[in-house]
Amino acid sequence: MSNGIWQDWSVNRQDLRMKFILGSFRFAQKLHRWPKAVRWLAAPYLFVYQLLVWWELGIELNHKAKVGPRLRLHHGYGLVVHEAAVIGADCTLRHGTTIGNRRESADCPVIGDRVDIGCNSVIIGRIKIGDDAKIGAGSVVLHDVPAGCTVAGNPARPVGA
């Protein structure tokens, strides 16, 4: 766990708030992996995590989500990541972004490595975002995005050459 925290901190050097949020998130993830028989011992911390990070700071970074190392958060406020979402390594998330389900609870995106997601983007449903993709600000992504592709708009469509 500590290795994951240091990796996250290394790419969020300038922002103490994001370091606090990511450190709290990684610790909550670690506690959630405890065996079910003793997981109740983690309940007070998980409650405080939700109280401070979710309710007070407005960042719903669910500790059940699978998030790779070196996650970059720019501002982060208004961020929502569903518990069934998968986010790869070296991804960047900006404020106002929603990554979640469309219908069923488990119908959540799988986001590859090195994906850059612009502010106020919505990525919902059982879709895949390929490695090195870019999601433009304000985009609504409802379909798969190939690796290396840049998409923007509502609904999101490929842009550029």
Residue ranges, per PLM feature:
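Short, composition-biased local secondary-structure segments
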Residues: 55-59, 100-101
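Terminal amphipathic alpha-helical/low-complexity segments used for targeting or macromolecular assembly
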Residues: 1-57
